[in-house]
Amino acid sequence: MADLVPVLTIDGPSGVGKGTVSKIVAARLGWHYLDSGALYRAVAVAADWAAVDVSDTTALVKCAFDTCVNFAECADGEMRVLVNSIDATDVLRMETTGVLASTIASISEVRATLKKRQQMFRRTPGLVADGRDMGTVIFPDAKYKVFLTAKAEERAQRRYKQLMKKGVSVMFGALLEEIRARDARDACRSVAPLKPADDALLIDSTCMEVDEVVAQVLALVTD
């Protein structure tokens, strides 16, 4: 039964390293990996492609229900995301997509539509799920829960370096402002607000290297 499959949830705000840590931990454990944020971004992309008005809840819910999302791992280990059979990986990573996804994620009907789809990722031998409400809403019965945090300034700096490395010109101040705004939206929304589960291990990654965070998370599961 799916309920017997172990789940490790890793929640936290944007830019704390959830995705990087989750992928490494999943690979080390040999478990499946769920990037819940990619699902919301995929719906955001599909809605944008279909010119859906973000104020039209009915249309957005239909879009969330109809959008086909597939994850394909390349030979180099990179995960590509296909939205309605089109590789949308690069579009999903754009800042504008993240902003739209955050707006869409605040709609309760959309979250309800995607909830069951996320829960279907729970398969043997185990699942590492990263997002914002994995441990509080999607998998409240998860055996292992982690909540990652980091100061907004540090998260903005990490994102700034990522974008500069890709040749994308961006203002640090604008990035910091957007991260703070997204934090506020995620924490204050009426449905599934961003917060740690009562039984989650809290890890502040502000001054930590990725391998240090990975070690703490793995210790939670293996010790």
From Swiss-Prot:
InterPro entries: Cytidylate_kin (IPR003136), Cytidylate_kinase_dom (IPR011994), P-loop_NTPase (IPR027417)
Subcellular location: Cytoplasm
Example of a GO cellular component annotation carried by this entry: cytoplasm
Catalytic activity from the UniProt record: CMP + ATP = CDP + ADP; dCMP + ATP = dCDP + ADP
Pfam families on file: Cytidylate_kin (PF02224)
GO biological process, one term: pyrimidine nucleotide metabolic process
Domain of life: Bacteria
Ligand binding (ATP): 12-20
GO MF terms, alphabetically ordered: ATP binding; CMP kinase activity; dCMP kinase activity
Protein EC: 2.7.4.25
HAMAP family: Cytidyl_kinase_type1
Name of the protein in question: Cytidylate kinase
Species, as recorded: Xylella fastidiosa (strain Temecula1 / ATCC 700964)
